[in-house]
């Protein structure tokens, strides 16, 4: 007898439909599984056989063939256990085929027949609904995550026996804990906690307003990390579409901590400088998302930038330009989104006190080696390069009457709304994404402003790339002041955010 059941597998943060076919025919008693299977999928036949046995169901002494279609795509993951078991039950005549029609099954089985959660259930359900499938059967631990998708009729079960009962008589009892929500409360860091560093705070607001990448250079204890950790709190709230995109990525990684709601806060990722290329960009045997994808629609902070390996930092070049990462391995290729705001910090030298020669003991050669660790193309992709001086005693012990993150966020939201309206007919939505070909359209300069930039171009020996970055940042500065056109004062401030190149790199500008 033949049966067919719907399921799906992950392809990046999307779901690919898979058909589980079972044929039971006369012949030597054998249980074969075909369809380009990974080891964990192939091992599933023993989990399924034993789980059915412990539910009181014995497989017939016949030739059993299980095919996972399409056969040209490698199947990975443990979510095929449940659909294989259901397909066997249908083929054995224990469940009517119409009970499983237009339903997607997914779940892992243990030997006792208990259903275990699987990664990536959110994109599986979301893409299933897009394809017109609205009924899903999943493990109970994945139930709330599945119900985040509108239009999905999801049933969650904790054991295979419960699934069999549901398919045979249609009875469904909601798991006892399905309606409960975790009570999670935690205090978010706030900009009001940062004393001093007004120049650095201003640069951070501009970076957030235009989604400009920023590098901070300063001695230890200057507040670079404190400001970076609070950067996500001044970005606009995630839209519903962005919440779903970010939640899909975290679901694929099994990191959706509270499965009763989509992620509400913008991600903040700060990998250690020993992170591998696969850890940063993604990859591994099963091609998982890396830190740059986990920071999608949020902030990626690289503390102590020169301590990262040069090969690891080079991985950032493509995502910074294309806002996505293409990963290719022997088992296949996937694309993960990676549209993030990059923040990086570093000391000015190995000891941290250059150019203060009273405290710095680094030689000129060691200084050169220190800055040579950083890729020039990566530096070129930083829109703002800001110096963070030491905080004075007066600033540190002041009354602490600092602006809160909410106050700054309100200004950032207003600034970004101006950009979204301006670029409503374009494929980009922030000033940092203005292509060079459209700078004259969106960053038009008056005669006085042109004369100023011509003077700065020759005085600072600017490259075309740096000149364009200054215009984009100046456009954001003008937006923060609600100015229709770029003014000389906007250009002057934008130039200041590129002025540390000569101080620390000398010939940083190409």
Regions found by a protein language model. Name each.
Residues 216-257:
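Walker A/P-loop
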Residues 18-24, 280, 383-386:
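Short beta-strand elements
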Residues 297, 303-304, 315:
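Walker B catalytic acidic pair
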Residues 205, 262, 267, 278-300, ...:
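Conserved alpha-helical scaffold flanking the Walker A/P-loop in AAA+ ATPase domains
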